[in-house]
A protein has these predicted regions:
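N-terminal alpha/beta PP-like core and its mobile active-site loop of ThDP/TPP-dependent enzymes
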Residues: 2-339, 382, 466-469, 501, ...
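A glycine-rich phosphate-binding loop feature that marks nucleotide/adenosyl-phosphate handling sites
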Residues: 165-170, 396-397, 543
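Generic enzyme active-site microenvironment
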Residues: 163, 300, 392, 444-445
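Conserved short loop/turn motifs at secondary-structure junctions
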Residues: 219-223, 364-365, 446-448
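Phosphate/pyrophosphate-binding active-site segments
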Residues: 2-5, 141, 295-395, 519-528, ...
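Active-site diphosphate/adenylate-binding microenvironment
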Residues: 11-15, 22, 29-32, 37-39, ...
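Thiamine diphosphate
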Residues: 110-121, 265-268, 292, 309-311, ...
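A structural motif corresponding to the C-terminal end of an alpha-helix
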Residues: 130, 378-387, 506-512
Length: 564
């Protein structure tokens, strides 16, 4: 009598495929039909981080992808859970972060006839507009190839989010184990180098060499590329001033003498040749229009050819991955050496010094209650002594002011709201950065922004992660003290509960909480939080009148022209 065949099922196959592709962490929220999949993943040595909301789990996966160049994995249940995670999937795609959202779903035969299955929804077609690609698996023998495709799509070319739909009947379907193992695909070289055209590289160097006022703008694509050494060598060899976008801060330290960040407006308005490195001429750079010289010539290094000429004509497009492109630029530079004119660097330094003096006066002014400037000055002092930490930042005024005040010293240590300026990334990014790196994380949050994902502090405490959350509490969205135009005594649309004690939340979850009202108290609490590696909330009491509506982008907010 022949030996009985060993059988396996869909959820075991997908977990084995994850393992064979060196996926070591899953972020998610369990429930029907994926609970046993999470249990089995954990049993097989894959770390499972359980969240309170799928959106935050997705943000954590995306942050992991940005930091590692490997797709972060988010696991959700069907329909409502899938929809909760969809914002994070879309945000990953817009920002160019590799992420795979795996969701359980209902039986296709019932969904397609709209017969009212449990949590019935055509999830794959719902995901398509918001993902780089979306795949559905209809039989267990296709699970391996589906995951392989998802991995390759998520990291190749411009990275992005990929959706993988796993119906419950596929997860439960069985097949012979030995046969199942033959269906698993280990992805080799998932993101092959994309070499730029040599003529484009030569043209780029030639244009930069002729420039009188060149400028390099580093975007988060440059940070993602991990081409840190090549970028430093090129900038320091040519002495071209550079301007980092927010998540590119730290590729070269913000204190580097060639940083033009403190003279940003002047640099953008006066540069004659600008080289964009993994940066897009989108709203964050005024589409290359307002505040820019009309005759500025652009060089753009980007992996996505469709990005070229999106807002301004690009004189020299260099299409390829950033690392290969910069390697080519360095090789060409040896044949055509040049140095940026000293007069351009000198005039930038004059403007930097003038602006730095104005900022110093704001930072050193003692007020009671605290405002954004003196509070962030205290934070800056502490983080200067803790340069290995990861900084997560979201809010309106909290984001804008922290970006300008807090220096970064190492690459990929700053994560923030990104291209969409989305609120709610804070706790997910903080957890993703902490789990991925094992290092302390400081999340600087506006009180409104914190509310989007605040319950994830329980997740932080449950896993005992070294995350310190600094909440700038002025009692409102943008600012407190709004006016109720109805006269009925209701809260203003921009008001939050005044005098809230966010630090007390930690009493419920056995974390550490501080309520601070002075810069000395803030320095002490932040230093202690970082050094203790304990989950910590610091409630920073800020003047309700501090800040402006929508922070630095008030101009984007339409104003009513009639009525109250």
């Amino acid at each position: 009598m022949s030996d009985q065949l060993q059988m396996t099922d869909g959820m075991h196959i997908i977990v084995e495929a994850l393992k064979q592709n060196n996926i070591d962490t899953i972020y998610g929220v369990v429930g029907i039909p994926v609970t046993d999949m999470a249990r089995h993943a954990q049993a097989e040595g894959i770390r499972y981080i359980g969240f309170r909301h799928e959106q935050s789990a997705g943000y954590a996966a995306a942050a992991s992808g940005f930091l590692t160049q490997k797709p972060g994995i988010c696991l959700t249940v069907s329909a409502p859970g899938f929809l909760n995670g969809l914002t994070a999937l879309a945000n990953a795609t817009v920002n160019g972060f590799p992420m795979i959202m795996i969701s359980g779903s209902s039986d296709r035969a019932i969904v397609d006839l709209q017969q009212g299955d449990y949590e019935e929804l055509d999830q794959m077609n719902a995901a398509k507009p918001y993902a780089k690609a979306a795949f559905r698996v209809n039989q267990p023998q296709d699970l391996g190839i589906a995951l392989a495709r998802a991995i390759r799509v998520s990291v190749s070319g411009r990275p992005g989010g990929v959706y993988l739909d796993l119906p419950a009947n596929v997860l439960a379907a069985t097949m012979e184990k030995d046969e199942a193992l033959t269906t698993i695909v280990k992805v080799e070289n998932p993101s092959p180098a994309l070499l730029p055209c040599p003529k484009s590289v030569t043209s780029a160097i030639s244009l930069l060499a002729k420039a009188e006022r060149p400028l390099i703008i580093l975007g988060k694509g440059a940070a993602y590329s991990q081409a840190d050494e090549q970028l430093r060598e090129f900038i320091e060899s040519t002495q071209i001033p550079f301007l980092p976008m927010s998540m590119a801060k730290g590729i070269l330290e913000d204190t580097h003498p060639l940083s033009a960040a403190a003279a940003r407006s002047f640099a953008l308005a006066n540069a004659d040749v600008v080289m964009l490195v993994g940066a897009r001429l989108n709203w964050l750079l005024a589409h290359g229009k307002k505040g820019w010289a009309a005759d500025t010539q652009f060089i753009q290094l980007d992996i996505e050819p469709q990005e070229i000429d999106s807002n301004r004509p690009i004189a020299v497009p260099v299409v390829g991955d950033i690392a290969s492109s910069m390697q080519g630029m360095l090789a060409e530079l040896k044949q055509n050496t040049f140095t940026t004119p000293l007069v351009w660097r000198d005039i930038l330094n004059i403007h930097k010094q003038q602006n730095a003096q104005k900022m110093h006066e704001k930072l050193s002014t003692d007020t009671q209650p605290l405002n954004y400037f003196n509070a962030l000055s205290a934070v800056r002092d502490v983080l200067r002594e803790n340069q290995d930490i990861y900084l997560v930042n979201e809010g309106a005024n909290t984001l804008d002011n922290a970006r300008n005040i807090i220096d970064m010293y190492k690459p990929r240590r700053r994560l923030d709201c990104g291209t969409w300026g989305v609120m709610g990334i804070g706790m997910g990014y903080a957890i993703g950065a902490s789990v991925t790196s094992g290092s302390p994380v400081v999340a600087i949050e506006g009180d409104s922004a914190f509310g989007f994902s605040g319950m994830e502090i329980e997740t932080i405490c449950r896993y005992n992660l070294p995350v310190t959350i600094v909440i700038f509490n002025n009692g409102g969205i943008y600012r407190g003290g709004g006016v109720d135009l109805s006269g009925a005594g209701a809260p203003s649309p921009t008001d939050l509960l005044h005098h809230a004690r966010y630090d007390k939340l930690m009493d419920a979850f056995r974390g550490v909480g501080y309520n601070v009202t002075t810069t000395d108290e803030l320095r002490h609490a932040l230093t202690t939080g970082i050094q203790s590696r304990k989950p910590t909330i610091i409630n920073v009491v800020i003047d309700p009148a501090a800040g402006t509506e929508s922070g630095h982008i008030t101009k984007l907010n339409p104003k009513q022209v009639a009525g109250n």
